[in-house]
């Protein structure tokens, strides 16, 4: 986030020093948090205008109109975000992450509450972004989507990376699904945790 300055060393993202040029870096990054919603008392257009001005987007009015149209939100242009459906609010959040066409995206359950049409539409936009040199960090429990979209992935449980690599590399056979991989790794981790917990109880007794 850039809120804490490093006591030593430097962090560069996209070749930009995060401490020296935080605004330049943020202009190249988009983010959709899992549980965030757009501000209640702004309309979708007002929120996108706000985000666009923060990022110094040129020709902002046309960009806002483009993404409002792209997400089918034209009829909601004068509606407060608090009065939108969950799916519509998610579209606004995605539009705020896409509007400046970033080189780096962080997405946490980005397709939550979206209907299948917009899931496919967004997925294709993201795949095109990667083809054009962009990078996406995607967090999701929808393993089928992750398998279709990601060329590398990490399986994390309780903050610990259990495995990382390509989808093919994580599988023990061609017949194994990503769900099978997850259950194999996380299930083993849970069983191990339960075993250690039981041993601890036994030792106390």
Placement of each model-derived feature along the sequence:
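Conserved ABC transporter NBD signature motif
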Residues: 9-17, 24-25
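Conserved ABC ATPase signature
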Residues: 80-84
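Conserved catalytic motifs of ABC-family nucleotide-binding domains
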Residues: 101
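Catalytic Walker B motif of ABC-type/P-loop ATPase nucleotide-binding domains
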Residues: 105-109
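ABC ATPase "signature
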Residues: 164-165
């Amino acid at each position: 986030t850039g809120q804490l300055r490093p006591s030593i060393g430097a962090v560069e993202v996209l070749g930009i020093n995060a401490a020296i040029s935080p605004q330049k870096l943020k202009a190249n990054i988009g983010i959709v948090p899992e549980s965030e919603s757009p501000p209640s008392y702004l309309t979708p257009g007002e929120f996108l205008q706000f985000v666009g001005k923060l990022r110094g987007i040129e020709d902002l009015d046309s960009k806002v109109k483009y993404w409002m149209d792209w997400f089918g939100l034209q009829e909601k242009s004068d509606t407060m975000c608090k009065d939108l459906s969950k799916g519509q609010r998610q579209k606004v959040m995605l539009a705020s992450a896409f509007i400046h066409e970033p080189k780096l995206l962080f997405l946490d359950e980005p397709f939550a509450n979206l209907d299948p049409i917009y899931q496919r539409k967004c997925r294709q936009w993201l795949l095109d972004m990667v083809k054009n040199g962009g990078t996406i960090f995607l967090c999701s429990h929808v393993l089928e989507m992750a398998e279709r979209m990601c060329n590398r992935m990490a399986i994390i449980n309780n903050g610990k990376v259990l495995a990382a690599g390509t989808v093919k590399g994580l599988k023990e056979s061609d017949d194994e699904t990503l769900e099978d991989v997850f259950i194999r790794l996380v299930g083993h981790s849970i069983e191990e945790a339960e075993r250690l917990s039981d041993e601890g109880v036994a030792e106390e007794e």
